[in-house]
Amino acid sequence: VVWTPIGAYPKKFSGSFDGKGHTIRNLCVDYETAAQGERVYLGLFGCVEGTKEQHAVIRALQVEGSVQAASGFSVYTGAIGGIVGNAEYAELSGLVSRVAVSADENVGKAAGLGGLGGVLVNCTLTNCGNEGDVSGVKNLGGVCYELYSGTMTGCYNTGSVTGTGTY
């Protein structure tokens, strides 16, 4: 079964999710863009957005599986991660991603790919890890591709990160 991300753009997830230490196995996000210029946000959660006063929360969860994106044309923008594609004002804690994250050259040039999270803005990551492999053209990272105005404490990456592009 192919998974549709929780909080698919533009309907972002803004609540609290406590995995209570459980493991989600065989996650399968196999996405092919449907329209040129489409925004791509993929993972167990596609888009997560809290506020400065009330952060969204995802905690105590392990995820295993794969997230892959392909397109016959360049996408506008996007973020792809094993657990979270894009997040703003979120607290992520006790998360482990064992998800293989990949994108073809058309998606990979525009999207940020990370093992646990793609693009994270004003987020706090605590005791999180990525053990899955990340592959694409460029814009790649282990735990996440980009953490902007946030903090990361006690996090690790053991997955490989492989880029095939040049600047």
What name fits each language-model region?
Residues 1-167:
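Surface-exposed repetitive/solenoidal architectures
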